[in-house]
């Protein structure tokens, strides 16, 4: 249900907030218009999936993200440019120029995926 969208619009990138502390700024992939089987996804379902989304693209991390050695003894879970899986409904949601972003805590990241296409909430 997700598409692999990265931030390529320079005007949009310039308007994004700088994450502070332990926060990670992520871009939310846009929802596909159709399922893998070719069925169109209704707008209400797309909105529900966007709200409960579990996949994001890491734009930038705050200066203190993953700095707690006791909590992250093996280092950061993710880096800029990674697609991540995070807890549903987590983070502060906001839109810039019609595109959704979130600020999440560093310990909310649960996994890294190479390509978000083909993933959906269970």
Q: Model regions: which residues?
A:
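Compact, glycine-rich, soluble single-domain proteins
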Residues: 1-122
């Amino acid at each position: 249900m997700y598409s692999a969208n990265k931030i390529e619009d320079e005007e949009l990138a310039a308007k994004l907030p700088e994450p502070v502390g332990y926060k990670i700024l992520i871009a939310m992939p846009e929802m596909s218009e159709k399922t893998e089987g070719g069925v169109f996804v209704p707008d209400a379902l797309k909105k529900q999936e966007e709200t409960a989304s579990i996949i994001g693209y890491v734009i930038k991390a705050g200066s203190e993200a993953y700095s707690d050695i006791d909590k992250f003894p093996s280092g950061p879970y993710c880096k800029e440019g990674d697609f991540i899986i995070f807890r549903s409904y987590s983070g502060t949601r906001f839109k810039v120029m019609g595109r959704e972003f979130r600020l999440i805590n560093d310990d909310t990241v649960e996994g890294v995926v190479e390509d978000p296409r083909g993933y959906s909430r269970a």
